[in-house]
């Protein structure tokens, strides 16, 4: 069939050949033109979609729905939290300052000075001698017998430590007044009735610290 078509083409007059060639060329140009047109339309459509996506992405937060609002920055949240905490911190500082008003720096200093003298000065030697004589003269108890049988250096240290404990219990470095001491003495009175040695030590501690309370 191809050979028959070729034979017919050879026998065809030259002017018909030209017409057919022109028609074929025109069809090719039209086909190419349609392809370019389709490609141009596709490009325009892509550009339009891209433009719409860009506009949608640049929408300001104020135009977003409430459920799509942008999250608050961490710094903003931290600032808000610090503002909420600030009154509490101020309250704590004021509370500490009010507690400081209940303390007497003068009494604290005098108490620490007295305790230091008991451990390092002649006052401590005089104290342990007095306590030893009073414990020796009192009615014998298991506690008194235990103290009297201690080695002298150990006994002196124990008596000084017990005296310090009573000083800090009765004075406490606060604005201690006589009525405060009386109240604290009443608190420990049942215990002192059972522990006569402790009562003797407490009495000597009070004798040493009375001037601090009366200041």
Curated annotation (Swiss-Prot):
Residues 12-34, 51-71 are annotated as: Disordered. GO terms for biological process: symbiont-mediated suppression of host innate immune response; symbiont-mediated suppression of host JAK-STAT cascade via inhibition of STAT1 activity; symbiont-mediated suppression of host JAK-STAT cascade via inhibition of STAT2 activity; symbiont-mediated suppression of host type I interferon-mediated signaling pathway. It is found in: Host cytoplasm. Keywords: Host cytoplasm, Host-virus interaction, Inhibition of host innate immune response by virus, Inhibition of host interferon signaling pathway by virus, Inhibition of host STAT1 by virus, Inhibition of host STAT2 by virus, Interferon antiviral system evasion, Viral immunoevasion. One of its GO terms (cellular component) is host cell cytoplasm. The keyword Glycosyltransferase does not apply. Residues 51-65 have a biased composition (Polar residues). Residues 15-22 are annotated as: Involved in self-degradation and in host STAT1 degradation. It comes from the Viruses. The disordered region at the N-terminus is involved in C protein self-degradation in trans. This self-degradation of C protein may play a role in the regulation of viral RNA synthesis. The disordered region at the N-terminus is also involved in the host STAT1 degradation in order to counteract the host innate antiviral response. The C protein is found in virion at a ratio of approximately 40 molecules per virion, presumably associated with the nucleocapsid. The P/V/C gene has two overlapping open reading frames. One encodes the P/V/W proteins and the other the C/Y proteins. The different products prevent the establishment of cellular antiviral state by blocking the interferon-alpha/beta (IFN-alpha/beta) and IFN-gamma signaling pathways. They inhibit IFN-alpha/beta induced tyrosine phosphorylation of STAT1 and STAT2. Blocking the IFN-alpha/beta pathway requires binding to STAT1 in the cytoplasm. They inhibit IFN-gamma induced serine phosphorylation of STAT1. Block the IFN-gamma pathway by binding to and stabilizing the parallel form of the STAT1 dimer, further inducing high-molecular-weight complex formation and inhibition of transcription by IFN-gamma. Belongs to the respirovirus protein C family. The different isoforms interact (via C-terminus) with unphosphorylated and phosphorylated human STAT1 (via N-terminus), favoring the formation of parallel STAT1 homodimers. The different isoforms do not interact with host STAT2. C protein interacts with L protein; this interaction has an inhibitory effect on viral transcription and replication. This is Protein C'.
